[in-house]
Amino acid sequence: SENIWIAKSASVAPTAYINGPCIIGRNAEVRHCAFIRGNAIVGEGAVVGNSTELKNVILFNKVQVPHYNYVGDSILGFKSHMGAGSITSNVKSDKTLVEVKCNGNVIPTGLKKMGAVLGDNVEVGCGSILNPGTVIGCDTNIYPLSSVRGYVAAGSIYKKQGEVVTKEPR
């Protein structure tokens, strides 16, 4: 199709749907029934899995969204991983413009649709929801079944709303 670039070394299942514009990098894998709606960059070695839907996204190299994920209007950093069924919610339920909330500050985006921004090496647990405008710092873990909003600092473990701890050095 038009405006679709797929690296020769990438693997795309015959049942995957890809709409342009889209770039799929070297050694990336687009699995069975993946649904790429367009405006997507899938980095080198990234995995877009079974029944995962992408729209208006940048997936940096080695990102994994391997099982039943929705990632819309979002940026996922190097080697970030979203567990099965985790999603980026990109529209507020009251349909107002998305704001990013960080350390008591409110940053207006001017956007009706904005998902999440994940730093490098973020691990999102299964079944988690990243609410519109969520920003997660590098090297952070999100526990399964979490509903995350606002800013989560780099090097954290997000256990639940109001319970975020700093990772211990290894």
Segments from the language model and where they lie:
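The repeat-register position in solenoid repeat domains
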Residues: G25-R26, R31, E44, K55, ...
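Residue-level "contact hotspot" at macromolecular interaction interfaces
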Residues: N3-W5, I23, I41, I75, ...
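Glycine-rich hexapeptide-repeat left-handed beta-helix
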Residues: N50-S51, N56-K62, P66-R170
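Short, functional N-terminal and low-complexity linear motifs
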Residues: V12-P14, G25, E44-N50, T88-S89, ...
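Transmembrane beta-barrel architecture of outer membranes
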Residues: R31, R37, I41-G43, G49, ...
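Extended, small-residue-rich solenoid/repeat segments and analogous flexible loops
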Residues: S1-F35, N39
